[in-house]
UniProtKB/Swiss-Prot annotation:
Name the record gives this protein: Phosphoglycolate phosphatase
Leader peptide range in chain numbering: none
Underlying gene: gph
UniProt source species: Caulobacter vibrioides (strain ATCC 19089 / CIP 103742 / CB 15) (Caulobacter crescentus)
Annotated CDD domains: HAD_PGPase (cd07512)
List of residues binding Mg(2+): 15, 17, 177
EC code: 3.1.3.18
Keyword set, alphabetical order: Carbohydrate metabolism, Hydrolase, Magnesium, Metal-binding
TM segment ranges: none
Job of this protein: Specifically catalyzes the dephosphorylation of 2-phosphoglycolate. Is involved in the dissimilation of the intracellular 2-phosphoglycolate formed during the DNA repair of 3'-phosphoglycolate ends, a major class of DNA lesions induced by oxidative stress.
Family indicated by similarity: Belongs to the HAD-like hydrolase superfamily. CbbY/CbbZ/Gph/YieH family.
Catalytic residue positions: 15
Length: 237
């Protein structure tokens, strides 16, 4: 009978926004502050929520377009930095871990799994967020897009995260919420699990994950299933 002990020594990589933490409220708030500073109308929460997860520049590009003023390429770097500053100042005003996250991470760590964050968010923002919501102690490393050879969906990002904690892709799982996570896992030769409660515009069942789960409490069972019964997929590296 499979148990949590089967995950001893395994590496589990987690996306951050929309997977571990519901960050949309603070990201939407920061975007709307920038839009207001540029004399543009605020955007509805539900619209912006689906724009989250591809990095600050992508969020600003989509947000400005939705507000009726495409982002000017020359002004973009300064606006991105201003957005980051605004967001960092309120990074966990309303953000919180999804239900079950703390319990599951504690169980996985106790079982001996190596836990790492693999996110397209900048590393400094990621660590600040994890500190603010008290999740940092669970993770051995945080690999943001700026620390990877290329960001997800490039498999080298997932592979770099696994390597950062001394893991092996042959005994690793990627947990995320988007097509970038599913493809990043597949391209690294790692089985991928997607949660259904995150930030994606497409039906999560269509994104090519090995498993889809509807509660974070199902993460351990999904990892055990994939690591004990399924060979690792062929790497695209």
């Amino acid at each position: 009978m499979s148990t949590l002990h089967d995950l001893n020594g395994a590496t589990i990589a987690f996306d951050l926004d929309g997977t571990l933490v519901d960050t949309a409220p603070d990201l939407v708030g920061a975007l709307n502050i920038i839009l207001a500073q540029e004399s543009l109308p605020p955007l509805p929460f539900d619209d912006v929520r689906l724009m989250v997860g591809r990095g600050a520049r992508a969020l600003l590009e989509r947000g400005f377009a939705a507000a009726g003023a495409p982002l000017d390429a020359e002004q973009a770097p300064a606006l991105v930095q201003r957005f980051i500053d605004v967001y960092l100042a309120r990074i966990a005003d309303e953000s919180a871990p999804f239900p079950g996250v703390v319990e599951v991470l504690s169980d996985l760590k106790t079982a001996g799994a190596k836990l790492v964050v693999c996110t397209n968010k900048l590393t400094n923002l990621s660590t600040a967020l994890l500190d603010a919501v008290a999740l940092s102690p669970f993770f051995e490393a945080v690999i943001g897009a700026d620390l990877a050879p290329a960001a997800k969906p490039d498999g080298r990002h997932v592979a770099a995260a696994v390597a950062a904690v001394g893991g092996d892709v042959s005994r690793a799982v990627m947990i995320g919420d988007s097509v970038n996570d599913a493809l990043g896992a597949r391209n690294a030769g790692v089985p991928g699990v997607l949660v259904s409660f995150g930030y994606t515009e497409e039906p999560v069942e269509t994104l090519g994950a090995d498993l889809v789960i509807h509660s974070f409490l199902d993460v351990p069972k999904a990892c055990i299933t994939l690591l004990t019964s399924c060979p690792a997929p062929n790497t695209g590296l």
